[in-house]
Amino acid sequence: MTTKPTRIRRGFITEVQVRWVQNGSLRNVEKSSDALAINVLAINVLAINRSIMSLRCREKRPLMMRLMRRVIAAFDQKLRDIRYQAVPRRAALLGLISSIALLTGGCATISPRNVLPQANAGQIDLEGFHNIRFWGDASAPAIEAIVMADAPRAQAQSSPVSNLLAISGGADDGAFGAGLLVGWSDAGTRPMFDLVTGVSSGALIAPFAFLGRERDGQLREIFTKYERKDIYIYNVHGLIDGSALADDTPLAHLIEKYVDAAFLQEIARERAKGRILLIGTTNLDTQRPVLWDMGRIAMSNNRDAISLFRKILLASATLPGVFPPVRIQVRVGGKDYDELHVDGGITRQVFIAPSIFSFVAGNQKPARTVTKRRLYVIRNGKIDPEWQSVSENVLSITTRSISTLIKNQGIGDLYRIYSITKRDGIDFNLASIPSDFSEVRSEPFDPRYMNALFDRGYDLASHTYSWVKSPPGLELTPQARN
């Protein structure tokens, strides 16, 4: 006997489908491959969610919600069981979200936003702060006007060489950059940087690199002592009543642990010397990169400075869909609004604001005579193509495509930076994870993997690391080097 569908205004779910969800597919999840299991569960979520949405969150919702939560629980368990190996972490998570992005909506419990109107989107100052941020894609004169306005000035360093550092994102691959910096310190050749920039996991490294080798012990600890549960907790229920797949409260607590009042005072002291620390986030409403002058925040004497400092670091590391976006409160015309900020790597995986090259050394008093400028770029990832057999299913294809997109976006950022250095006569130096590094993760933020990667970076830098002088595909000939 054919089961009559329970018809609803926009879509339907049959009793057969309900029993399939309750009995068949859930029993088979543990026997399925990861990709197949996730796709089966996603289909189940689709069927139930269509019904919930069509009911407009009213009658008959309890039954559908119970079924939904059971499927989500199985989905959650499957995610915990997955052993991410060859697939990059960010791409794997984005792939999962892309596969189920259309499955959710309608009944969210997120508090409503008071979105900053488009007409006021150019509002750059936050109440109580001045000249602490600027658009990362603004014209060079606009950036220079903000960074140089009322700029702290101090006695110039005696060195005629100006050293600049840019650190990319990379999630747990940030262990490479951390190890490289610590090894560089122990080799006795790491310079003091006039400018440090960071994005995503690079944003968590940058403040420690900015403060110098005295903070190397903490940098090592952050990237070798913690595991996934110390960074985030799976929250698949967020797919139906939230804004993210995971809860990043543990990461927020870690940031609070290391970024305390004394830390902020050190940042402020170095900014007073004319040194600059920039962290990048992405404003989702405007689709634009935002660069934050963290030293000015530290120097502001605003009681909310430490909270904002921490919030920006968290926002820069917030992969949208995986972690909830960070709301930044702004006040315009006596009214309170909010902006949504996420991973700076969405718009720039590594960055240097071009106009800063021209005046970072002149930001000191008396004006410093610089005869040479060096830029060091740490790319926390592999640059070379990596072969992988891709299964012909939605999840595998989506994940592989996104990982390829991310890798090539990062290479494009390197090309952009390289062209600026060639134009302005700056010595370009690039470090990235060696292609022969073969350690495999058992899960995201696997301590064994991160320790091995940290050690690899440390060993390279402590034995006179050979920095690459150009991005991939632009290898210089001996004549060009001269």
Give names to the regions the model predicted.
Residues M1-V87:
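N-terminal secretory signal peptides that target proteins for export/translocation
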Residues R89-L93:
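N-terminal export leaders
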Residues L96-S98:
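Hydrophobic helical h-region of N-terminal Sec-dependent signal peptides
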Residues L103-G106:
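C-terminal motif of bacterial Sec signal peptides marking the signal peptidase cleavage site
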Residues A108-L195, F210-N482:
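Patatin-like phospholipase
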Residues T197-G198, G202:
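Gly/Ala-rich beta-loop-alpha elbow adjacent to hydrolase catalytic centers
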